[in-house]
Amino acid sequence: MSKTIMKDKDMETSIPTLAVDFDQYDPKNIDVWEEYIPIGNEKERLTMAIKSANLPYLIESEKGQGKTLLTHTICKENKIALVNEPIGVGTKKSDLIGSKEINRDGTFFSLGLLPKSIEVANHFGHACLYGDEGSNQEHEVQQLWHSICDGRRSIVANGKQYKLNNGCKLAIIWTINPVTYAGVNSMTEALRSRFIGSAWNYPSNSDMESVIDWTDISIDLIKTPLLTLAQDIYALKLKGDVEYALSIRDLVQFTHHYREIQDKISKPLETALNEVVMIKFSEPAERELIRLRIEDTFDVKL
């Protein structure tokens, strides 16, 4: 059980706190949906950050590069409890700190993500709080992370201070997209100063080639032009011509989808290009630009 002490006499008198369901954070219940294949030393570095839990760790990268899978994999392999709940534009103070709930037994306080994570760490001895796309939170909400991300390692909720017990660890991992993403909030300077971390580059052709299953995929007709298309679209994004770049996840979708339909329909290549690549671009001018690139790269007609 975690230590809780009164923080401020002027704070509202606390009410009974609902118990945390620790089973859902138990390392044995962590879901790892596929194998993570490292590209460089990113698994080693993140493993060190999670195991040491000394400083919050930030990963900045394009979408679809396996950040969530890697975090799940590391926690599962090292038997570290994982707290992974959605945060983003709609995240409110009550989501992070907690809120009152009324049921047939009375009024209770339901812990939010931050004090709950401390409770989980104290229960298991070591936990990881994973915040995917954390910078999408409003700046006022990001400020609520300050005390748990610095030397205080604590948070006040329901009139009590939740703090790590001696010998217990809480790793805090955030992932964010580059600020070039449309609609992405920036991470505040005050919060970013509390993190160390790494920026993952957009994967090269050799990176993508090494982590994707190319079984039954023609090298000349599909693999080589698909890798070329991915790099071309990324270059278009850097120039501001499109807002979307193909990720490793997109290419995995393509290979899976193509294998599924190749013997079932006519023109499976054109269908896969339409249903996996073209569908990612919603703006008409962008879609037309990508269509022309696809036709030129694959020598097909869409």
PLM features: what roles do these ranges have?
Residues 1-302:
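C-terminal regulatory/interaction module of P-loop NTP-utilizing enzymes
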